[in-house]
């Protein structure tokens, strides 16, 4: 063991021999590059000054997208905006559900009494030629209220009011002309006239709206000529109440 230690102590100076040779050679013949080529691997000089910053390199490739961040806090309430324009009318919505029954209403005022129903219509089923007399109609189709007298051919007003009357008469073919008058309490309201040569028939009509008092009478009076009457009822007389008056 002691012998080995002695050998190491004799070899130790040999380890520093290359370094010393490099130093001597460098001192005797320096190169333009600094250290001799044979000592570039075993000799190191002092640190040099820091160099200048080089130009920026090209942009690198895009990085991987980061994770989605958390939602931020609600911002402060903004100022009220200006009033907008009126929008278009929307579509009709669905029908709502049926509501509940409301409370019973109060008792109402007495209603208007129903109007009296008055109407008649008569016709000639046979010829008539009694001049200057009231026309007696052989058939009565309608007589609501029975205010038309079938025996006299006269209508008696049961209430004061406004009445409508109409009549249509066919001239008999044996005469050329015929006159019929609408009478009101013995006074002529208007006339009906029809003319046609013998052998031919002709039909004429007229209408009236009269204000009658209760008890007034209205009828038709025959003038000259003759009227045609048969089952087809060409000659008729009708009237009805429009409304009552006070």
UniProtKB/Swiss-Prot annotation:
This is Complement C1q tumor necrosis factor-related protein 3. Gene3D superfamilies: 2.60.120.40. Pfam families: C1q, Collagen. GO terms for cellular component: collagen trimer; extracellular region; extracellular space; protein-containing complex. Its main location: secreted. Residues 113-246 form the C1q domain. Residues 1-22 form the signal peptide. The lineage of its organism: Eukaryota, Metazoa, Chordata, Craniata, Vertebrata. PROSITE patterns: C1Q. Keywords: Collagen, Secreted, Signal. Residues 51-113 form the Collagen-like domain. Residues 80-107 have a biased composition (Basic and acidic residues). Residues 65-74 have a biased composition (Low complexity). GO terms for molecular function: identical protein binding. It comes from the Eukaryota.
């Amino acid at each position: 063991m002691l012998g080995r230690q002695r050998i190491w102590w004799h070899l130790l100076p040999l380890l520093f021999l290359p370094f010393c040779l490099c130093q001597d050679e460098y001192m005797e013949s320096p190169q333009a590059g600094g250290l001799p080529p044979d000592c570039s691997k075993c000799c190191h000089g002092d640190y040099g000054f820091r160099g200048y910053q080089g130009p920026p390199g090209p942009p690198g490739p895009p990085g991987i997208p980061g994770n989605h961040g958390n939602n931020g806090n609600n911002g402060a309430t903004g100022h009220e905006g200006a009033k907008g324009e009126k929008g278009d009318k929307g579509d009709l919505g669905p029908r709502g559900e049926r509501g509940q029954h409301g409370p019973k209403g109060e008792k109402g005022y007495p209603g208007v009494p129903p109007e009296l129903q008055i109407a008649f219509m008569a016709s000639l089923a046979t010829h008539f030629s009694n001049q200057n007399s009231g026309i007696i109609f052989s058939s009565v189709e309608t007589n609501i209220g029975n205010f038309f007298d079938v025996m006299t051919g006269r209508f008696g007003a049961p209430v004061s009011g406004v009445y409508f009357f109409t009549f249509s008469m066919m001239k008999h073919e044996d005469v050329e002309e015929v006159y019929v008058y609408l009478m009101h309490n013995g006074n002529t309201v208007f006339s009906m006239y029809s003319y046609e040569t013998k052998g031919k028939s002709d039909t004429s009509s007229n209408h009236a709206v009269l204000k009658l008092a209760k008890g007034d009478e209205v009828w038709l009076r025959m003038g000259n000529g003759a009227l045609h009457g048969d089952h087809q009822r060409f000659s008729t007389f009708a009237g009805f109440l429009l409304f009552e008056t006070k």
